[in-house]
């Protein structure tokens, strides 16, 4: 009987020894667990880095970048013409200036057969002013205005001066008449040129 009683106890102890892990197994389990967690965290971080950002896949943001590039190109086209096309050469610019000077010289001289002393006086006055402006810098616009006025007076006559001259007795100033400021002048003829010629008293002997 004693033998039978001890046998179940020994079996129970053996069963308990088999169910519980040994100290060696527990130590390996504890040491391996942090390394597994580290590998898992590293894998998660790699996945996070490999996921594209929202701005990379957002079609609106790509369109915005394209529009910004197009805007930059357009602005640089205006500020830097050489980006899209070749700038004008100095030879072309000089050729254009010479052509304009030739045009103003040919059509600005009074007609020999006109016999109009007023047209001759106006042409001489304008020619003198043109020669003065040619020797001055930064007066290109004023020079072209006087040259164009000489061409217009030579082709159309000087009736505009006779109309607005207070010294012309056959063109008296009437009340309610149109003033120079309100009148629509010939295209290309500046009102400043009219005022300049009226101040020269060219009409006093006419």
Curated annotation (Swiss-Prot):
What GO biological process terms are annotated to this protein in UniProt?
DNA repair; negative regulation of double-strand break repair via homologous recombination; positive regulation of double-strand break repair via nonhomologous end joining; positive regulation of isotype switching
* Keyword hit for DNA damage: yes
Q: What is its main location?
A: nucleus
| UniProt-annotated stretches for the region Disordered | 1-21, 33-69
Q: Subunit structure of this entry?
A: Component of the shieldin complex, consisting of SHLD1, SHLD2, SHLD3 and MAD2L2/REV7. Within the complex, SHLD2 forms a scaffold which interacts with a SHLD3-MAD2L2 subcomplex via its N-terminus, and with SHLD1 via its C-terminus. Interacts with ASTE1.
Q: Which organism is it from?
A: Bos taurus
Q: What is this protein called?
A: Shieldin complex subunit 1
Q: Pfam families attached here? A: SHLD1_C
Alphabetically sorted, this entry's keywords are:
Chromosome, DNA damage, DNA repair
